[in-house]
Design a protein with these regions (language model features):
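An intracellular "coupling" helix at the cytosolic face of ABC transporter transmembrane type-1 domains
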Residues: 84-85, 101-110, 114, 118, ...
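Hydrophobic alpha-helical segments in the permease module
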Residues: 42-53, 146-153, 219-233, 252-274
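ABC-type nucleotide-binding domain
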Residues: 308-568
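Alpha-helical segments in transporter systems
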Residues: 1-20, 24, 38, 42, ...
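Short intracellular "coupling" helices and adjacent cytoplasmic loop segments at the cytosolic face
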Residues: 65, 73-97, 101-105, 176-200, ...
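Transmembrane helices of ABC transporter permease
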Residues: 1-10, 112-166, 237-250, 267
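Cytosolic ends of transmembrane helices, especially the final helix of ABC transmembrane type-1 domains
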Residues: 193, 217, 265-292
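Transmembrane helix-loop-helix hairpins at lipid-water interfaces of multipass membrane proteins
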Residues: 2-55, 59, 132-137, 247-252
Length: 568
């Protein structure tokens, strides 16, 4: 920035020297007065002005772009630290629009308009000083135009600011709609909803068009008004200056120099006016960015997590709701002993997935606490705590990239040997080896190039690579065939050994072998015990097992009555 200001000063100085040379030439004009040195000085001043202007413009633009890059980086890092609750209430498209469109408006301001503003201010300030030095009376006449310009520009600026805010909001809505439709394009096509989505898109685009037209009207008025004011000012100055010359109060060369300085002041003033017009537009974008940056980030915590294998995971009278007046978990109170498997079953909407979210610290309990080894998990270092958790979800999300990228996502220093061992344990070796590029095969957006069972096996392999202390499974084998399930279940049995494991289960085979079963109903635990104990003591569990849990045809009917499963 300092170098840019130096270049700007040199450019301004070079531009302001020319009218002085012109004054001397006009006042004492003769062929003898035109010396080669004078011509060389004038040419040198023009060259210095051109080169200095280019260097100053580049340096100022570079500095401005660095500022925008810093804002984008800060915004991106802030997104990564925002709690999950923020993403529950805001669309991904809206947040993406803040990072791309809003910062793009800032880039236009600081990268395109700011350089002209800085050089314009320097030229205008120094030029006005020379104008007062040449003739202070005509300078006062010139300054009389400022209130007239402000009377027009201030209301227009307010209109543009309000319009810019509406444009940013509408652009964010369009980005959100685009992200929603494109990410679920298969659902759109399968539902025959193209016409509906076309209409939604047309309405949003039409709204942007109307706002852009309003902004264009304001912008189209600015330049003509400024041009009219400056032309009137120039006519007045020339007329009044002619009277001053005829009266002898000002020389002809002084009038020429005054007009040249006036032009050098008028042109920067136009740039400054355009800059402040763009500032009004950027205010809307800036307000949105500041609003995002003001959102509180996740509490990272500082307490180190106790060594692996020591802790008991405890839900201590936990109450939680996604909305203030609607509790999802109601006084949840249970413990998971080290090395044991606990299965959570119950009707849909009872809060099973929410339990997982609280363990991961995606949300904080409204009251009560989730404890590990006697400590509130909210006090643990967040990165350390989550590194101790392995999660195999039911939908098994994947990132666009290769199979290797997804297996090692968030895990540093994974060797090929460790990777293939995990792949083998998850029964994924055969299908990965059959792919043309093996683990380097691209899985596509959200893993669309793989089947559900393949995605699930990759999620299991990723959990194996994490070597977690706490393992959370959301019906981890639901998408596998019988043969694959047996192989993967064996790998999971190995993985679960010595670890605290929590399973959301819909299959009878998954829950029968659990050390403890929790029946979660409407946010409360209404039954706990082994499969056999709950069959005898919990009527709703028995009904649920008969009607909702799916099991293989090889399982005998007596497995429901005595708590055993054939083949286990």
């Amino acid at each position: 920035m300092g170098l840019a200001l130096v270049f700007s000063l040199l450019t301004t100085a070079a531009g302001l020297v020319v009218p002085l040379f012109t004054k001397s030439l006009v006042d004492g004009f003769s062929l003898q007065s035109i010396q080669p040195s004078t011509v060389a000085l004038i040419v040198g001043a023009f060259l210095l002005q051109a080169v200095g202007g280019a260097l100053a413009g580049y340096a100022l633009s570079y500095s401005g772009l660095k500022v925008v890059a810093s804002v984008r980086s800060r915004l991106w890092n802030h997104y990564l630290r925002l709690p999950v609750r923020v993403f529950d209430t805001r669309s991904a498209g809206d947040l993406a629009s803040r990072l791309t469109n809003d910062t793009g408006v800032l880039q236009s301001l600081v990268g395109d308009q700011f350089p002209g503003f800085v050089t314009g201010v320097l030229s205008a300030v120094v030029g006005v000083g020379f104008l007062f030095w040449l003739d202070w009376q005509m300078s006062l006449v010139m300054l009389a135009a400022i209130p007239l310009v402000m009377a027009v520009m201030v209301p227009l600026g307010r209109i543009r600011w309000k319009t810019a805010q509406e444009i940013q909001g509408e652009t964010a809505r369009l980005s959100g709609l685009l992200g929603q439709v494109l990410s679920e394009v298969r659902l759109v096509k399968a539902s025959g909803a193209e016409v509906r989505e076309r209409e939604r898109g047309r309405e949003t685009v039409s709204g942007l068009f109307r706002l852009g037209r309003r902004e264009g009207k304001v912008q189209s008025v600015v330049a003509p008004i400024m041009g009219l004011v400056m032309m009137l000012l120039l006519v007045v100055i020339v007329g009044y200056g002619g009277l001053r010359v005829s009266s002898g109060a000002l020389t002809a060369g002084g009038l020429v120099a005054f007009i040249l300085y006036l032009i050098q002041v008028v042109m920067p003033v136009t740039q400054i006016a355009q800059f402040f017009s763009q500032v009004q537009k950027a205010r809307g974008a800036t307000d949105s960015i500041v609003e995002i940056l003001s959102l509180p980030v996740e509490d990272l915590g500082l307490l180190p997590v106790p060594p692996e294998g020591r802790g008991t995971l405890v839900f201590d009278r936990v109450w939680f709701g996604y909305e203030p007046d609607r509790a999802v978990l109601k006084g949840l109170d249970f413990s998971l002993e080290p090395g044991t498997v606990t299965a959570i079953v119950g009707p849909s909407g009872g809060g099973k997935t929410t339990v997982f979210s609280l363990v991961e610290r995606f949300y904080r309990p409204d009251s009560g606490a989730v404890r590990w080894d006697g400590f509130d998990t909210a006090d643990f270092d967040l990165t350390d705590w989550r590194s101790r958790i392995g999660y195999v979800p039911q939908d098994c999300p994947l990132m666009a990239g290769s199979i290797r990228d997804n297996l090692t996502y968030g895990i540093e220093g994974v060797t090929d040997q460790a990777l293939w061992e995990a792949v083998g344990a998850a029964n994924a070796t055969e299908f990965i080896s059959a792919l043309p590029e093996g683990v380097e095969t691209q899985v596509g957006e959200r893993g669309v190039k793989l089947s559900g069972g393949q995605r699930q096996r990759l999620a299991i392999a990723r959990a194996l690579l994490r070597n977690p202390t706490i393992l959370m499974l959301d019906e981890a084998t639901a998408s596998l065939d019988a043969g694959s399930e047996r192989a993967v279940q064996g790998a999971l049995d190995t993985l679960m050994r010595g670890r605290t494991t929590l399973v959301i289960a819909h299959r009878l085979s998954t829950v029968v072998g659990a050390d403890k079963i929790l029946f979660l109903e409407d946010g409360r635990i209404t039954g706990r015990g082994t499969h056999g104990e709950l069959l005898r003591s919990h009527e709703l569990y028995r009904t649920f097992a008969e009607q909702q849990l799916r099991w293989r045809g090889t399982m005998e009917e007596e497995s429901i009555s005595d708590g055993t499963v054939a083949g286990r």
